[in-house]
């Protein structure tokens, strides 16, 4: 089942990761609310995610990098990915990075190609 969650703490991130990755892939969408590029990337992502079949086994968490900068940096460090915003990080069921992109790399086409893998 696809769903979008907001996480606000490191504990919530760890809980989501531990409960989700057993059965689903996890998308982490990091954004900055006041940024135009983040706004556009979020709209593209929301449209793509909304178009997925309901039975898609994907969970998404959105992270406001202004409000949650330490969490955003923790995720980047844990996954060995440079912190950026907007940024989408796609984890497979094993918790490994399947795809990641930032700014103008976040497109419906790129997401569709990753979904097909």
What function would you assign to each model-found segment?
Residues 24, 83-85:
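Short, small/polar residue-rich loop motifs at catalytic or cofactor-binding pockets
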Residues 41-45, 71, 75, 84:
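Amphipathic alpha-helical interface surfaces
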Residues 1-25, 116-117:
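N-terminal leader/targeting and pre-domain segments
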Residues 7, 30, 54-72:
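Thiol-based oxidoreductase modules, predominantly thioredoxin-like and allied folds used
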């Amino acid at each position: 089942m696809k769903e979008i969650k907001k996480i606000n703490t490191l504990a919530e991130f760890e809980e989501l990761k531990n409960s989700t990755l057993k059965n689903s892939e996890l998308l982490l969408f990091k954004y900055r609310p006041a940024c135009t590029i983040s706004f556009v990337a979020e709209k593209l992502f929301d449209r793509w995610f909304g178009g997925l079949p309901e039975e898609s086994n994907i969970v998404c968490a959105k992270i406001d990098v202004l409000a949650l900068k330490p969490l955003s940096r923790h995720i980047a460090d844990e996954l060995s990915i440079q912190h950026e915003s907007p940024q989408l990080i796609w984890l497979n069921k094993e918790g490994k990075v399947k795809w990641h992109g930032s700014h103008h790399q976040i497109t419906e086409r790129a997401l569709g190609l990753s979904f097909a893998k």
